[in-house]
């Protein structure tokens, strides 16, 4: 599983529609993620930030994540901008530190 944090900014039209309708975007997001084996872990609005929303989700692989991004962001039309960050569990980072000694590398020199 991969864990992703996605921050996104709605278009002005989408923000207006959400506030006027009271639409539950969290449920809409779940409907895209869950059929692909993913899980919405958290969803937050962000006040005073460039981005309007932030969500943390898990996916079986990057393929399913990219499919959701393509459908919801590139094809959806309601998102003006976004930033994706892959979250790495600290256990994975610790495991990587144990492998470092096995890697051959020579840094460039002047």
List where the protein language model places each region.
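Short S/T/G/P-rich N-terminal loop/turn motif that feeds into the first structured element of a domain
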Residues: 1-35, 39-51, 62-67, 88-110
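Short cationic amphipathic helices and targeting signals
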Residues: 52-58
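A structural signal for short, well-ordered beta-strand segments
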Residues: 6-8, 55, 82-84
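An amphipathic, aromatic/His-enriched active-site/gating alpha helix that lines ligand/cofactor pockets
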Residues: 58-90
């Amino acid at each position: 599983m991969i864990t992703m944090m996605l921050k996104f900014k709605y278009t002005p039209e989408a923000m207006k529609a959400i506030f006027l309708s009271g639409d539950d975007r969290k449920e809409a997001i779940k409907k895209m993620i869950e059929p692909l084996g993913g899980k919405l872990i958290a969803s937050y609005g962000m006040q005073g930030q460039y981005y309007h929303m932030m969500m943390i989700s898990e996916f079986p692989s990057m393929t399913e994540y990219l499919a959701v991004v393509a459908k919801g962001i590139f094809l959806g039309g309601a998102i003006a901008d976004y930033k994706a960050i892959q979250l790495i569990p600290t256990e994975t980072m610790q495991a990587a530190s144990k492998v470092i000694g096995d890697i051959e590398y020579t840094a460039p020199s002047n």
